[in-house]
A protein has these predicted regions:
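Gram-negative bacterial Sec-dependent N-terminal signal peptides
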Residues: 1-22
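A compositional/structural signature for long, glycine/proline-rich flexible linkers
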Residues: 20-469
Length: 469
């Protein structure tokens, strides 16, 4: 994974307070690119927060601050919203403002149903993962405490320290796609609860949505990438400096790059003036936003590691790998920890040839060697068309998994069929309909097992896909 180019890691190279230091045009370009990439996840997350919450009522993945928005069913076959849609779990999303006091997130007893509530700060790493893996299915209360809060945690609550003012919960609750199961999940979603700590448990607490801002400063419908490009270099760095001031202070491990950024005048709480760097440098940085996005696009193509023909990406935790964090923000915002979910995918068969619906393919799990998970696994079929999308088909079937009552072979192995036309009624339980053109299957493995065989340590890998002559 490519690291930030030109970053001087020597601690103690702090810039003097105030004006930017004298640097050459080339030095300024290098530092500016580093700074832009460093802040990309923060600015992306903040733009996304505003777009998702600047509404007067909950509707799907949009809801006012302090309220859950719940998705009630899988996306339809013709969905073209967010690439690589999910047909295994229903989303529940909520943002909270911890600036005045902590908030409490509560969920009911989930029984043996798989669920996951990854929690993110504004920089986009997973800071906690309440759910089946970490806490089991019993009802629970989580105290979300913002920076500097020193109060007493009430009995029966689990504290989650949040290093930024705002916090996101992007929950997933398993659903099998039937109307009966949707109703059961929707009933659980209705019990996902948020309240300020001062109002927790008070029967007279009534949620009141914040007013909608009619002039938020940018489009509420454009993709965050486009919104950020529209900020320009000066606007972007000013937004970054403002966010780092109070809402999202940089982590201690970021001190080296913060010192570098100060050399061109990008500092928390201080206005950034591009012209102060001189006309030559200002001209050289004019196209920085597009250049940075191009850089992230190139890194997206090489971020995953290929194993046995399948591509894996280790995301969710980033440390000082600012490029990886920015790539995920740009093209896969946000992401789970591998311990919670792994999503290997492939675009080629065992001979390295691109997968296409013009051919027929099989994937066979040897007896006892299906994906090793504590949660569940499934394989989703996507057609490739400026994104990854469901494949409309007569069965309205977008995934194949054990919930299809897979039919084993005589030796106990399980063969799955990836093709455009039905392999026959007797094989349709194991069939994942493919488009006529290019496609990719993605395996979703929730709560993968840690002991071997495990996808986490590479002792288990998905079998390769075989073209059928």
């Amino acid at each position: 994974m490519r690291r930030i180019c030109g970053l001087l890691l020597a601690a103690g190279m702090a810039a003097s307070a105030g004006a930017a230091q004298a640097v050459t045009v080339d030095e300024a370009k290098t530092i500016a690119m580093d700074a832009y990439v460093y802040g990309y996840s923060l600015v992306t997350t903040e733009v996304t927060r505003v777009q998702m919450t600047n509404v007067d009522k909950a509707d799907g993945l949009h809801a006012p601050m302090g309220q859950f928005g719940n998705v009630k069913r899988y996306p339809p076959a013709d969905y073209r919203g967010v690439s690589a849609p999910n047909a295994d779990t229903l989303y529940s999303l909520a943002w909270m403002d911890l600036g005045s006091e902590p908030w409490v997130f509560s969920h009911p007893d989930m029984g043996d149903r798989y669920f996951l509530f990854p929690t993110y700060d504004l920089w986009m790493p997973v800071i906690a993962s309440p759910g089946s893996r970490t806490a089991g299915g019993k009802a629970a209360h989580y105290l979300m405490a913002g920076p500097g809060w020193k109060g007493e945690v009430p009995a029966g609550m689990t504290k989650i320290d949040v290093p930024t003012r705002y916090v996101l919960i992007l929950g997933r609750t398993y659903a099998n796609g039937t109307d009966k199961d949707y109703a059961e999940v929707n009933a659980l979603q209705a019990q996902y609860d948020l309240s300020p700590l001062s109002s927790f448990g008070k029967a007279d607490y009534v949620y009141k949505a914040p007013p909608v801002d009619p002039n938020p400063g940018y489009s509420m419908t454009d993709k965050p990438q486009q919104v950020i490009l529209g900020m320009g270099t000066e606007g972007y760095f000013n937004r970054l400096a403002t966010l780092m001031c109070h809402d999202a202070p940089p982590a201690a491990e970021d001190a080296p790059i913060i010192a570098e950024m100060a050399k061109i005048g990008v500092e928390p709480c201080k206005p950034f003036n591009l012209s102060a760097l001189g006309p030559d440098t200002a001209a050289a940085l004019k196209d920085l936003p597009q250049q940075a996005l191009d850089l992230l696009g190139k890194n997206e193509a090489t971020m995953g590691v290929e194993k046995n023909g399948w591509v894996f990406a280790q995301v969710g935790a980033y440390g000082t790998d600012y490029v990886k964090r920015a790539v995920v923000a740009a093209f896969g915002w946000p992401a789970n920890l591998p311990e919670d979910a792994v999503y290997p995918y492939t675009m080629v068969d065992k001979d390295g040839q691109p997968l296409t619906g013009a051919n027929k393919y099989t994937l066979t799990f040897a007896k006892g060697e299906e994906p090793p998970v504590n949660g569940f696994w499934s394989i989703t079929m996507y057609e490739i068309d400026q994104g990854w999308w469901f494949v409309p088909n007569a069965l309205n079937k977008f995934t194949v998994s054990p919930r299809d009552n897979l039919v084993p072979n005589a030796d106990g192995s399980v063969t799955l069929y990836f093709q455009n036309e039905s392999p026959g009624k007797d094989k349709e339980a194991n069939w994942l309909p493919a488009p006529k053109g290019a496609f990719l299957p993605m395996i979703r493995m929730y709560w993968p097992k840690e002991k071997s065989p495990s996808i986490l340590n590479g002792s288990w890998l998905p079998p390769q896909i075989v073209k059928v002559d």
